[in-house]
Amino acid sequence: MLTLKIFVYTVVTFFVSLFIFGFLSNDPGRNPGTKDF
């Protein structure tokens, strides 16, 4: 059960990191070609 918890927390942290990285990458200041929502 402990291993399952660690696995779930690792996956959640991984997806949160991807979301934050994608949000920063979509910054209009870095990508002038994209529209600013």
Swiss-Prot record:
The chain crosses the membrane at residues 4-24. GO terms for cellular component: chloroplast thylakoid membrane; photosystem II reaction center. Its main location: plastid. Keywords: Chloroplast, Membrane, Photosynthesis, Photosystem II, Plastid, Reaction center, Thylakoid, Transmembrane, Transmembrane helix. PSII is composed of 1 copy each of membrane proteins PsbA, PsbB, PsbC, PsbD, PsbE, PsbF, PsbH, PsbI, PsbJ, PsbK, PsbL, PsbM, PsbT, PsbX, PsbY, PsbZ, Psb30/Ycf12, at least 3 peripheral proteins of the oxygen-evolving complex and a large number of cofactors. It forms dimeric complexes. Belongs to the PsbI family. PANTHER family: PHOTOSYSTEM II REACTION CENTER PROTEIN I (PTHR35772:SF1). This is Photosystem II reaction center protein I. It comes from Nephroselmis olivacea (Green alga). The lineage of its organism: Eukaryota, Viridiplantae, Chlorophyta, Nephroselmidophyceae, Nephroselmidales.
